[in-house]
C-alpha cells in the first residue's frame, strides 16, 4: 500500500502520514511498513533445518518488502551522484561487486570495496555529491558501520541493504532496502543465502536503466569480465 493510497483512505495528506511515522520514531513511511512486516513475521532466533524450497520463500518475502517509492528515490540518487561507492564484506561482497560492474558499463563511477582500509580511504574522499551503498545482512558489520559513519560525516548519502529488523546500519541510512535472509542448517552447516541481496542489486540496476536508459553511455564488458 503506497503512502498516497493510505492517505486517500484516511482522508488526510501523504505528508501527514509521513509526519505520523516520524513521530513514532521511523525515518518515514517505508521504514514503518518494513517494521510492521517484521512484527508480522515470526522471528527465527536460531538456525533451523532447511528444505531447498525455503530459499524461494525468502526470495518471495524479500520481493514483498521492496517499496517502489524507495526504489525510485534510490534510482534518482544513483543518477545524480558523482561517485557511487559500495561497501560489503564476506559473502555480501559478490552482489556489491556485480552491481558496481554493471553501473560501470553505463558510464557511472562505481566501485566496490571489501577491505576496511580501502573503505575508509574511500569514505574520507567523499562529498555531498556522492553516494554509498552499504551491504550487510546483519546491519551490524563493524567495518562497514565505521566507513559509513565517515561517509555520512562527509555529506554523502547512504543507502543500506540489511536483513529485516532494527539494526545500526539501517538506522544511519537515508534510504533502506530490506531482505529476508533466514539462518538455515544444511548437513550441520549454518547457511545464510545472499541471493536476496543479489536480486535487489539486479533489480535496482534494471530499474535504473528503465528510468534513465535514453541518456546513458553503454560500454560492453571486456571478454575477461564476461567469462568470469
List the predicted regions and their residue ranges.
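Conserved small/polar residues in nucleotide/adenosyl-binding loops
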Residues: 218-225
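Residue-level recognition of alpha-helical structural elements
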Residues: 67-70, 152, 216
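HTH-adjacent hinge/linker in prokaryotic transcriptional regulators
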Residues: 1-73
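Glycine-rich phosphate-binding loops that contact phosphosugars or nucleotide phosphates
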Residues: 79-199, 203-213
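Short, flexible micro-motifs
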Residues: 18, 28, 91-93, 142, ...
Amino acid at each position: 500500500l503506497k503512502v498516497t493510497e493510505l492517505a486517500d483512505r484516511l482522508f488526510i495528506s501523504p505528508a501527514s502520514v509521513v509526519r505520523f511515522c516520524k513521530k513514532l520514531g521511523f525515518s518515514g513511511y517505508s521504514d514503518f511498513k518494513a517494521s510492521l512486516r517484521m512484527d508480522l513475521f515470526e522471528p527465527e532466533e536460531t538456525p533451523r533445518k532447511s528444505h531447498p524450497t525455503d530459499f524461494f520463500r525468502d526470495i518471495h518475502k524479500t520481493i514483498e518488502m521492496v517499496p517502489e517509492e524507495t526504489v525510485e528515490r534510490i534510482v534518482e540518487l544513483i543518477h545524480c551522484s558523482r561517485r557511487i561507492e559500495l561497501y560489503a564484506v564476506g559473502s555480501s561482497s559478490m552482489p556489491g561487486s556485480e552491481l558496481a560492474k554493471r553501473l560501470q558499463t553505463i558510464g557511472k563511477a562505481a566501485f566496490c570495496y571489501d577491505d576496511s582500509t580501502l573503505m575508509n580511504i574511500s569514505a574520507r574522499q567523499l562529498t555531498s555529491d556522492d553516494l554509498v551503498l552499504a551491504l550487510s545482512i546483519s546491519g551490524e558489520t563493524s567495518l562497514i558501520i565505521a566507513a559509513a559513519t565517515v561517509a555520512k560525516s562527509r555529506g554523502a548519502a547512504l543507502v543500506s541493504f540489511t536483513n529485516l529488523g532494527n539494526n545500526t546500519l539501517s538506522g544511519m541510512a537515508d534510504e533502506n532496502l530490506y531482505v529476508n535472509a533466514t539462518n538455515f542448517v544444511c548437513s550441520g552447516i549454518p547457511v545464510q543465502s545472499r541471493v536476496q541481496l543479489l536480486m535487489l542489486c539486479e533489480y535496482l540496476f534494471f530499474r535504473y536503466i528503465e528510468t534513465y536508459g535514453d541518456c546513458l553511455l553503454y560500454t560492453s564488458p571486456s571478454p575477461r569480465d564476461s567469462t568470469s
